[in-house]
UniProtKB/Swiss-Prot annotation:
One of its GO terms (biological process) is maintenance of CRISPR repeat elements. It comes from Thermodesulfovibrio yellowstonii (strain ATCC 51303 / DSM 11347 / YP87). The gene is cas2-3. Its EC number is 3.1.-.-. Disulfide bonds: none annotated. InterPro entries: CRISPR_associated_Cas2, Virulence_VapD/CRISPR_Cas2. It comes from the Bacteria. This is CRISPR-associated endoribonuclease Cas2 3. Belongs to the CRISPR-associated endoribonuclease Cas2 protein family.
Length: 88
């Protein structure tokens, strides 16, 4: 199962809608950053939901895919938000 890091740059009036969608699929780790494992089917569903909300002329959502969550290293400077878990 791929492990994704998702970041976004969204116009203020759509930020809450985008955040709400991403929270259904990923763990929220910072203001505009989410991460987590996801199936291809759920990833497709997430992207379809986002496409209905974003304005492709001004908004951006970036998906960084890693083979799995064991093949990357994360270093945090400062406080790391508590991850309570995510059911996919």
């Amino acid at each position: 199962m791929p492990y994704l890091i998702v970041t976004y740059d969204i116009a203020e009036e759509r930020v809450n809608k985008v955040r709400k969608i991403l929270k259904k699929y990923f763990m929220w780790v910072q203001n505009s950053v989410f991460e987590g494992e996801i199936t291809e089917g759920k990833l497709l569903k997430c992207k379809l939901e986002l496409e209905k909300v974003i304005d492709k002329e001004v908004d951006s959502v970036y998906f960084y895919s890693l083979e799995n969550r064991l093949n990357y290293r994360k270093t945090v400077l400062g406080i790391e938000k508590e991850i309570t878990g995510n059911i996919l």
